[in-house]
Amino acid sequence: MLDLIKSHNNWISIIKPWYQLARLDKPIGFLLLMWPCLWSYTLGSTIFSYNISLKYIIYFILGSILMRGAGCTWNDLLDKKYDAKVKRTQSRPLASNKISSVNAIIFLIFQLFLSLLILIQFNNVTIIIGLLSIIPIIIYPLMKRITWWPQVFLGITFNW
């Protein structure tokens, strides 16, 4: 029984930094992405008389989780040295060196790849809009260096 508890704790200690890097412990971010997607999908389905598909609802939910995680990973990669100096952020996996930058980049690529696999299930207009949404995701962490109001740009990013 003790071995089971030890292996359970080891498994959790391995997964926890990745879970935190993707901010799965703070679901508000993916909810901010997911609800507008689902709302727009249901409105569009009603207006254009499409049947609402559980498959697309699942795609929106998974895509929101993955892209929020990718955005947080990107943000933490760019802010690693700053996060290490700020009390609120110094325990983040990259700032505390629980995850290396190289491994975080691999994780970012993995999240983006899975997101792309989901995105290509949609029509061409949705794919183009989805690909263009990468631009504000890339830019947001950099805005913290040039403005006092980076959250305004974060709002634009979430509302894309």
Predicted feature residues:
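Membrane-embedded alpha-helical segments that form the functional core of polytopic membrane enzymes
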Residues: 37-38, 42-78, 88, 112-116, ...
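Alpha-helical transmembrane segments of integral membrane proteins
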Residues: 28-32, 51, 55-59, 63, ...
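Juxtamembrane/transmembrane-helix boundary motifs in multi-pass membrane proteins
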Residues: 8, 12, 24, 47-55, ...
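The first (N-terminal) embedded transmembrane alpha-helix
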Residues: 24-43
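Membrane interfacial helix-start motif at the N-side
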Residues: 16-29, 98
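Perimembrane helix-loop junctions in membrane proteins
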Residues: 44, 48, 80-83, 144-148
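Intramembrane alpha-helical segments
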Residues: 19-20, 92-160
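Cytosolic, membrane-interface loops and tails of multi-pass inner-membrane proteins
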Residues: 2-16, 72-99
